[in-house]
Amino acid sequence: PRTLIALAAILCTCSTLCARQKQDALVNYGVKAGFSSTIYDIMQLSVASVPIGEYDTKSEISSFFTAFTRFNIKRHYVQTEVSYNISNYSIHMPTTQWDPQADANDLSAIGTRINGLEVPIYYGYHIMKQGSYGMSFYFGPKAKFVIDNLSRYTFTNLPYDNIKETIRPINFSLMFGLGINISRVFFDFSLEYGLHNISQGIISTDADGNASRGNIIFDRRKNVLSFSVGFML
């Protein structure tokens, strides 16, 4: 029994030392996966030239998967990532706002499901770094490349046909986060703030068959709250 206890203690010590060596290495690699919630900052919303002031938003839980490289300099680090992200969001509004003859219970909706590759680069600092435990904060810019052929846009109960929205192919944001690590496992909490309007416009066809831009306007910035769990290789 004493031999087994001693062996277990040695293995635990070796595991901790290995984990610490990984954390103290000049370069680390890792993966993480998590969930996010999109919160749009709506800049302008109108239908048939009528400003929409009453609406409800619905942010569905989205998911992402990330691979990263971290360059360490004592308590400081710089991290680059490549992430595949799927974000879901919809907005619902009473139809009577632009159509007085509609039923009071009628609702119209715009839904988006945007797929994309995200490439952030940020600076981090370890607030606490002791043994196998640590805590850090980080911030930096992020670029998102929209994969339009995998994305989906839906328009329900709106007074136009053939509605098509164009999302900017590249969108930029700032990210702030807090990370907690236990040995090689870590947890990240982050807030992403969109820097600009992600919509390039919505084209639609009216009852006379005329296609035009501006019948529907849905200008917004994209903000994101996210949580992830990762493993440092």
Model-derived features: positions:
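Short glycine/proline- and aromatic-enriched beta-strand/turn motifs that initiate or cap beta-hairpins
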Residues: A19-T66, M232
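Juxtamembrane helix-break-helix junctions at the cytosolic face
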Residues: H126-Q130
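Outer-envelope beta-barrel architecture signal
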Residues: Q23-Y29, K74-V78, N115-L117, G131-F137, ...
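Residues on the lipid-exposed face of transmembrane beta-strands in outer-membrane beta-barrel proteins
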Residues: V31-F35, S63-I73, V82-Y84, V119-Y125, ...
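Extracellular/periplasm-exposed beta-strand and loop segments of Gram-negative cell-envelope proteins
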Residues: T38-E60, S87-G116, K144-M175, H196-S226
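Bacterial Sec-dependent N-terminal signal peptides
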Residues: P1-K32, L178, L225-L233
